[in-house]
A protein has these predicted regions:
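Anion-binding alpha/beta catalytic cores of soluble intermediary-metabolism enzymes, centered on
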Residues: 1-150
Length: 150
């Protein structure tokens, strides 16, 4: 029997559409034979889960061994005292997007997750020396060529 792959999802821009996309697709995602780890915060998911429809489907973890099937496992890699302002570009939202991407990438490089999905970020808001996800991953992984799949 094959083990279920562990899919890591970076949160993207906290004021962007990433968390909202995840919330709206939870039922389809959890029907798959996979384990999901969201790199962000419980605050972020509960904000976009407007009617608390999915609250019982979230599982806060501090270690990869705590993940549960049929849950969105949340690895908290963001500060809890931030404001969510949908549609606004703020310094925090850019920093949070980078922190989430970096944390998720480290988990992938350490073999703790099998697949990495990156939610959208505002490139002009991420004050880092890379153009976007693809270039960041290329440099972080130390490779010269890369390929993006949509």
């Amino acid at each position: 029997m094959l083990k279920s792959p562990i899919i890591g999802i970076s949160c993207g821009d906290t004021n962007g559409v990433g968390s909202e996309i995840l919330i709206k697709s939870i039922n389809r995602i959890l029907d798959l034979d996979v384990l999901i780890v969201f790199f962000g915060s419980m605050k972020l998911l509960t904000f976009y889960d407007k009617n608390n429809e999915h609250l019982l489907r979230f599982n806060l973890i501090s270690n990869i061994s705590d993940i549960k099937k049929n849950k969105i496992n949340v690895f908290n890699c963001l500060e809890d005292d931030f404001k969510i302002n949908p549609g606004e570009i703020t310094p925090y939202s850019g920093n949070a997007a980078y922190s989430s991407l970096d944390c998720a990438t480290n988990f992938a490089l350490e073999g703790k997750i099998d697949i990495l999905i990156t939610m959208p970020l505002c490139k002009s808001n991420v004050k880092q020396p890379f153009v976007g996800h693809t270039e960041y991953l290329r440099d972080k992984c130390g490779v010269s060529q890369n390929l993006m799949l949509l």
